[in-house]
Amino acid sequence: RFNDYHRDVRHGAVHVDTVELKVATPAEVVAADEFVGAFDAFLEVPIDEDPDALVAAIAGIGAKAKVRTGGLTADAIPGARQVVRFLRRCLERGVAFKATAGLHHALRGEYALTYDPGAPRGVLYGFLNVLLAAAFMRQGADDGVALALLDERDPAAIEVGDRFVRWRGQAVAADDLRAARHDAVAFGSCSFREPVDELHALSLL
């Protein structure tokens, strides 16, 4: 209805193609089915507990999952094992996902949690940590490897070539990375420039 009304230039000429919803139960996932098809639907799941039932329900309606990897306080940042478990469940269920919150930076490290002067600091995941962990898991890496990737803080440990990305003696081919992008659809950042600037600074772009 929104898109029908706003299609006309007199009403803004805008089009919504993606929606995001928080869900806490499989029943809430099923209720979100009305958005699937009309929109690209991402359903944000809590990961304090095993999200398998939620991810399975998301697979059942053909939606995508969303995970929150940071927050405005240090205690809002999930543990690495929780993140890996989410990635594993998505892989097992064939569910694509996006990750958001705290992913302004390329690699894990201690950063300010907001842009405010004197903001509290916390140890955040980098977007490369999350995306590479998902890619390595897709080609068979176990949870131990994924945990180590999520904790990687040394840019020298990552080598980017035309046909591969290599990390500490293990590699993912470019074709496999492209395939992994169908699983790891996107990451969220408040800044468009920060991720690009950091990749340039690390000579990874």
Task: List the predicted regions and their residue ranges.
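Expand to "…catalyze enediolate/carbanion chemistry for C-C bond making/breaking, isomerization
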Residues: 1-205
